[in-house]
Curated annotation (Swiss-Prot):
It comes from Xenopus laevis. This is Mitochondrial adenyl nucleotide antiporter SLC25A24-A. Ca(2+) 3 binds at residues 99, 101, 103, 105, 110. GO terms for biological process: adenine nucleotide transport; ADP transport; ATP transport; cellular response to calcium ion; mitochondrial ATP transmembrane transport. Ca(2+) 4 binds at residues 135, 137, 139, 141, 146.
Length: 473
């Protein structure tokens, strides 16, 4: 069916007037399943799906809303034809703006240059994948007919929106804050779309962290106390409930949620500054430079909010009634240990950024490119499940590499609050853990940490998508 539709749409490429009307009429006839002379959202969804035409989420609703001039919830043939005529005009403008050398075809270099002007740098291989998703004759170039038919039912009407159709950014919050920040185009920065994405991501992170807080607190307890009294996940959760009731499972979560906003803002600002510093004269920012800029941005953000990390750990390992809240905890730490206590464990925390961010980025790019090279037959869009899968696997591998440093950081943050515990530095703690608990002692608490990855990713994605709709992204 798709092949027939493509042949039909690609035929008579230069046709205007009545020929265009005939083309629209035949397409309308295919979509009007119940033959009532109108096409509604459901018929659009089913018809486009049957034709194999991939459109963005909610595209059918946007098409009907844009073309439905009499607001009856349907498109009659006149409305359908006018919508496609207007949409094709906008698509022609977008095509012309991409076709820099005016040869009537879009090439890989033109895709790369256009994305570059919007603040996105991609490889030649990625540009070719984008073209292949539209190229029906195998020439690795896209002419007007191929361009028009690919975006025929995509409601994007300018080059910036089409670029966003190609650009995929997924916000995943698994409770760790060492990932490299998202990229935003210059257009997104100018129009204010960036802060909406950050807000949506922040809300997703807050809900995700709250939903998985019991497992996060159990991880901290196991990191600090070893497996004593917490030999497995169920036993550990029961011990926490027995000590402080069900509410104690969320102890320390408030700080964990509150720190999302300042950390995200600082990381975004710092990343933009470091990118300017590392961008070459040609304006290109390679993968290595992006990794360095992202790692430095993460270190800057962590430095600014690190006292809140210490508060989170102290509240999580604290006993019932020990602290009345975040400010009481901060006050008691200051009085007893001084201001430097708020930066205990800072060095292993910063050192953990390099393996986490590096492995996370490297594995994500490897998995994404593997999919593009082996499975991207009809589209350069991997889809939600593939992107979520790549993000989950890469983040998990990053955690695995940096976990020993995270464990040492947590113990250094908490050791002053444990009576009789020696105040060891990073090296001393490492030797003590290996000598007493063996090599695998460096991975104490990793089971609940891994257990919360899947629900955390799922919750953050669902909330992020809902927030995008609410914010009109």
């Amino acid at each position: 069916m798709l092949e027939q539709v493509q042949k039909f749409l690609l035929s008579r490429a230069a046709c205007e007037g009545s020929d265009s009307h005939t083309r629209y009429a035949e397409l309308f006839h295919k979509l009007d399943v119940n033959k009532d002379g109108k096409v509604d959202i459901l018929e659009l969804q089913e018809g486009l799906k049957a034709m194999g035409m991939a459109v963005g989420k909610g595209a059918e609703e946007k098409i009907v809303e844009a073309g439905d001039t009499n607001k009856d919830g349907h498109l009659d043939f006149g409305e359908f034809m006018r919508y496609l005529e207007e949409h094709e005009k906008k698509m022609k403008i977008a095509f012309t703006s991409l076709d820099k050398n005016k040869d009537g075809k879009i090439e890989s270099s033109e895709v790369m240059n256009s994305l570059k002007t919007l603040g996105i740098n991609i490889s030649l291989d990625h540009a070719e994948k984008i073209l292949k998703s539209m190229d029906s004759d195998g020439t690795l170039t896209v002419d007007w007919n191929e361009w028009r038919d690919h975006f025929l039912f995509n409601p994007a009407d300018n080059i910036q929106q089409i670029i966003r159709f190609w650009k995929h950014s997924t916000v995943l919050d698994i409770g760790d804050s060492l990932t490299i920040p998202d990229e935003f185009t210059e257009e997104e920065k100018k129009t204010g779309q960036w802060w909406k994405h950050l807000l949506a991501g922040g809300m997703a992170g807050a809900v995700s962290r709250t939903g998985t807080a019991p497992l996060d607190r159990l991880k901290v307890m196991m990191q600090v106390h070893g497996t004593k009294g917490n030999s497995n996940i169920i036993t550990g959760l029961k011990q926490m409930v027995k000590e402080g009731g069900v509410r104690s499972l969320w102890r320390g979560n408030g700080v964990n949620v509150i720190k999302i906003a300042p950390e995200t803002a600082m990381k975004f600002w710092a990343y933009e500054q470091y990118k300017k510093l590392f961008t070459s004269e040609s304006g290109k920012l390679g993968t290595a430079e992006r990794f360095i800029a992202g790692s430095l941005a993460g270190a800057t953000a962590q430095t600014s909010i690190y006292p809140m990390e210490v508060l989170k750990t102290r509240l999580a390992v604290g006993k019932t009634g020990q602290y009345s809240g975040m400010f009481d905890c901060a006050k008691k730490i200051m009085q007893k240990e001084g201001i430097l206590a708020f930066y205990k464990g800072y060095i292993p925390n910063i050192l953990g950024i390099i393996p986490y961010a590096g492995i996370d980025l490297a594995i994500y790019e490897t998995l994404k490119n593997y999919w593009l090279q082996n499975y991207a037959k009809d589209s350069a869009n991997p889809g939600v499940l593939v992107l979520l899968g790549c993000g989950t696997v890469s983040s998990t591998c990053g955690q695995l590499a940096s976990y020993p440093l995270a464990l040492i950081r947590t113990r250094m943050q908490a050791q002053a609050s444990i009576e009789g515990a020696p105040q060891l530095n990073m090296g001393g703690l490492f030797r003590k853990i290996v000598a007493k608990e063996g090599f695998f002692g460096l991975y104490t608490g990793i089971a609940p940490n891994f257990l919360k990855v899947l629900p955390a990713v799922s919750i953050s994605y669902v909330v992020y998508e809902k927030m995008k709709i609410q914010l009109g992204i």
